[in-house]
A protein has these predicted regions:
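Core catalytic alpha/beta fold that binds nucleotide/phospho-ligands
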Residues: 1-214
Length: 214
């Protein structure tokens, strides 16, 4: 079964991973989709994107939900509809190539999974302080640059406001890849917000989860 792993980043945050090793047709037969989702699926040109989309729905079903429980707000941010008048869990979604991932929590969270690719070094100066990867081997530079992108992307998913700039507004503290956690700040609109970050390597991917630090 392509369910890959469940990760407890804290007692409040659980991440679920699905490895998209099945064919698109096999996945499609296994999930129940509302008409809106089916139309969206058909509009996707890439089979990889279609499989990732279905992988997320497989994870929802693994967690006791269905596609019918998932909605998106006007900005495209996902949320789970409440069940039996309960306060719904917060959800964050990410996917990259082989993997689909969701995070469920009772508090605001942002999740990102990224494939480790050398080309990240070409764009890294656009979104990060390159001093963070000085004096590292090339392999470590690539891994850390991908991690920092994931940190910024995860925080952006929580805040999700127009005008936020990765290099100008989101700042991560110095960390080592072996730490698997760090802290970061969003400095935007004359406010400073602190975030805790957890990250880990999954095969040749980096998984990052952000949540507010109180």
């Amino acid at each position: 079964m392509p369910f890959y792993k469940k990760i407890h980043f804290s007692d409040k945050i659980i991440v679920y991973l699905w490895k998209n090793s099945e064919t698109y047709e096999e996945l499609l037969r296994k999930v129940y989709l509302k008409d809106q989702s089916l139309d969206r699926l058909k509009s996707m040109r890439s089979e990889s994107h279609r499989k990732s989309f279905l992988g997320v729905r497989m994870l929802l079903e693994y967690c006791g939900y269905t596609d019918y429980d998932l909605s998106y707000d006007i900005s495209g941010k996902p949320f789970l509809n409440s069940k039996n008048n309960e306060i719904p869990l917060v959800i964050s979604i990410s996917h990259s190539y082989e993997f689909s991932a969701i995070a469920l929590s009772k508090e605001a969270i942002g999740l990102d999974i990224e494939k480790i690719k050398e080309k990240v070094l070409r764009i890294a100066p656009r979104y990060m302080n390159m001093a963070h990867i000085e004096n590292l081997s090339k392999k470590e530079q690539i891994q850390k640059a991908v991690t920092i992108w994931g940190i910024k992307e995860s925080i952006f998913k929580i805040k999700n406001e127009t005008g936020i700039s990765f290099p100008d507004h989101i700042f991560e503290e110095t960390f080592d890849l072996q730490d698997n956690h760090c802290k970061a700040q969003l400095r935007f609109n004359n406010q400073v917000e602190d975030f805790n970050i957890n990250f880990c390597m999954i095969e040749d991917y980096i998984l990052v989860c952000a949540f507010r630090s109180y």
